[in-house]
Amino acid sequence: DVLPFQFGNMARTVSEYADEMVSAMEKTRKDVERHNMLINDGHYKAAANIREVYVTPELREEVPYINLSPMKNSVDRLLASGKAFDDAYKAMAALGYNMSKDDINKLDKLMYQIEAKLTRPEGLPRRPWYRHHIYAPGYYTGYGVKTLPGVREGIEEYKWDETEEQMVKLAEVLKAYCDQLDLA
């Protein structure tokens, strides 16, 4: 039998995660700008308790504009590949999976091995034992899941070079995933 895989929902979910990363970058940028403005304009000092020693918070590094194209392009391709597979699967099901046993076995092998395409042998920053680039436990959250963990944690930790590097790696794993999906 043909394994019952569908990829459209997964593609839409990953697209939502990517949109969250874009929003997180913008929110972080605005938060840093506001934080620095409050320091520079003396608002923190004005609100400080005069009975306690006041220590001015440190200014934060401005959030750079990171090239989001690798992630966005790979997600767009994932959406297209997922839809194409789901459409072909429905058409094949309507015809009763009229395929040779050998073709069914090849298709099934492609499908059950596809999840491995979302991993990289070097793993994630600071924890190489976690290799999945869509879902992984957070570095600081224990077993709480992080979506697109390399990119998300780079943003959360203000590590912009790492964020950009992880965005490229995410695009690479999504490309490999789509390449395998397109073979099916």
What are the roles of these predicted feature ranges?
Residues 1-184:
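Secretory-pathway/membrane protein signature
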